[in-house]
């Protein structure tokens, strides 16, 4: 079963993921995109480490982390809504507080999407492979 991958795109902006991907080196970008493709095909019970992490703290329990590494640790915070995945806050993890900052950004993005569902748009990930 293919699930839809959506990304957060506020009006008049390209969105954080579309700004983030070109900053990565080619190998890491390709690995991250392969994980996104895998995410579209994965069963929810297979969202396990090392490539995926579910946050268990109540404040963040609707959020997950897609993880990939090369020379640096690339992460994308995402959520599941109506069976689809919404990719929210991408970041390079350099220190533990980077994750907390991305989680807080993701909660704000989710609030935006609740108020304006059109902020979650289908990702055309095929364009990046």
Tell what function each PLM region has.
Residues 1-72, 82-85, 92-129:
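Basic, Lys/Arg-enriched alpha-helical interface segments
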């Amino acid at each position: 079963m293919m699930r839809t991958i959506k990304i957060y795109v506020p009006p008049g902006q390209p969105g954080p993921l579309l700004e983030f991907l070109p900053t990565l080196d080619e190998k890491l970008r390709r690995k991250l995109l392969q994980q996104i493709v895998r995410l579209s095909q994965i069963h929810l019970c297979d969202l396990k480490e090392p490539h995926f992490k579910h946050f268990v703290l109540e404040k963040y329990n609707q959020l997950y982390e897609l993880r990939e590494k090369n020379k640096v640790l690339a992460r994308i915070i995402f959520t599941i809504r109506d069976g689809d995945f919404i990719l929210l806050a991408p970041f390079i993890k350099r220190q533990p507080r980077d994750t907390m900052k991305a989680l807080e950004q993701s909660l704000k993005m989710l609030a935006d999407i609740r108020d304006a569902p059109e902020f979650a748009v289908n990702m055309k990930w095929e364009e990046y492979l």
